[in-house]
């Protein structure tokens, strides 16, 4: 077994326990984690880069950044001689070995500094707190109002047309929606150039996946938050074969299940075209396949934790088609652009050629995906708008 600790010193000790022969490489790695922890997302706003002493302090980290930026996880894990440690380092972000090593080290660095982690209540609770603050400041939210088209008048974005026929006029339009849908559907592909076409035709997306969620009347208190293990019997999902399982155990989050119960999830490889076509052409088989996969996952977990199968009270299976229907995300991807050496070295524009008063934010302009990318890129756009209006950007804490 191998435990990934958020504290770099504990992580180093664990890595040395597993692979003492990789001691030199391990100590270099954990030293870089500590160096990178000085460069947290809000570092620029603390003034660290403005002071000579602060800038000199992060020079070693900047040099290391270049090294990791051009290296993917597949290459990074080969630095370790121990086969098990090499395998484990390649699994921290699932099976996505094209992921840049820079993203791996930064994530561990922010966790070491306790500037990143899991929000209790999950993403919904996280975004609910943002919405609450937005409403306090006078904002409005329109639910069940999907945008069909972005209204363009005289070369500027002037509002949005909803799929229910409604129209909302605006001085500025900011899209946090799916990038492909925004550019090629909502704007009908009228505002793009060769660079944008190249990005959307060649950049790697996060893969489409299946998510199996389970609620069990079994207490997993004290168990690891996540475990990854090989399968004796592979699970076939469409044309994808899964020979390992990464199981997320939410016993640490008491909001996810009643007392004495636990919520668990796992992700499986899933082909978008297969599941989308199956849902359209044979809904009965689509539903049957979801039930079969859920049953096989439960059976697999039961072998790991005897009695689990009988304790499961609720299941939910989301296919790539589900992701696309609920989120509109292109090709059912569970996030946006994958953080690869290529995407990390490319500046993705947040504006479109020939269109004024329009901006894009989120995971299609900042590789890596997730809610933080929406907040970080959104904040930068608001700063730009404040500058255009001659207003100083300030943050008022509630």
Report each predicted region and the residues it spans.
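A conserved FAD-binding loop/helix module that cradles the flavin
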Residues: 363-386
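Feature captures the FAD/FMN-dependent oxidoreductase FAD-binding
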Residues: 3-4, 11-12, 36-37, 135-136, ...
